[in-house]
Amino acid sequence: IIVIMDKTRKHLISLAVLTAISAIVPTATFAQLHLEIAKAPEQAPKIAIIPFTNDSAIYPIIENDLNRSGRFTSASQNLPATASINQIQAGDWQNAGVPYVVVGQIKNIDANTFEIHYQLYDVQKQQYLLNEVLTVPSSRVRQAGHMISDAIYQALTGIAGDFSGRIAYVLRNPQTPAQRYTLQIADTDGEQPKTVLSSRDPILSPTWTPDAKKIAYVSFETKRPAIYIQDLATGQREVLASFKGLNGAPSFSPDGQSMLFTASMHGNPEIYQMNLNTRQLQRMTNDSAIDTEARYAPDGKSFIFTSDRGGSPQIYRYSFDDSSVKRLTFKGAFNARGTLSA
């Protein structure tokens, strides 16, 4: 049960506690996944993903990825005769109203290696936008499908795709008290889930390191919130922050050398920065307000955070150059959980 208080400051206190230590969430959420909700194009362009020659596994992955993006509509009915590498008749696809076609083929290089040749064809321009070859081990064929989706998405939108990334999330299962909370990682389509940690106690705020080799999270296994970091390859974990009071909302610097987090070791929830090599702490905010949800800017020169220092929860920017703080949001009575794009 999540209780939202009526008064604004109580609401932000609730938010700070939820971000840093909240234990009670109804289902699987809390992923290191940025969700941008926007109006989908009224007529998303059609794209035909033709089954690859000698393979039936990759094209459904690409089709699913592009459909999930909301930027394209999969064309699957009343299509021209099956196209293949270097064999696309532009006129047939123009008549079918399909502006983009993806074809490909897979070849065995040896028992453990595949060569994947794929093409993205622009029907209107009658030219190939992509004509690429990937060589991958057999164990990474599925990952190659996501990589192809990334390339197609960027070629058509100008924006880098992230289908080949991974997501981290927490599952809560009240039916199994011994493993009520499970931290998992998976492909962006939810496939190939892997359990990182199972616990009777709440797990919150999973956060990737920039190199994606480790993940930080908040655990209540000692009956109070603490921030841990875990190596995904070895499973080795260590405590980063277990100070008196709240410890939560970890965020790594772009170079992976520092971490911002919220702590109340001195009574009030403030933002601290930890040097991950020396474990030295630096207090970044110091006032009577609730300061939480710090996130580094992509260039590492500043960070944004949520604070009620102006009377209501709003987003602020802290500059490392001069320690100045600037309010960024003014419209609305509640603005929180900001992130900065590159």
Regions found by a protein language model. Name each.
Residues 161-163, 210-211, 254-255, 298-299, ...:
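Residue-level detector of Asp-centered blade-edge/turn motifs that repeat once per structural unit
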Residues 160, 172-181, 198-201, 218-227, ...:
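A flexible loop/linker signature enriched in serine peptidases of the S9 family
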Residues 167, 215-216, 256-260, 300-304:
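Hydrophobic beta-strand positions that form the internal "hydrophobic ladder"
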Residues 34-92:
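Short beta-strand->alpha-helix linker/helix-N-cap micro-motif
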Residues 33-34, 63, 86-151:
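Amphipathic beta-strand/beta-sheet edge segments enriched in Tyr/Trp
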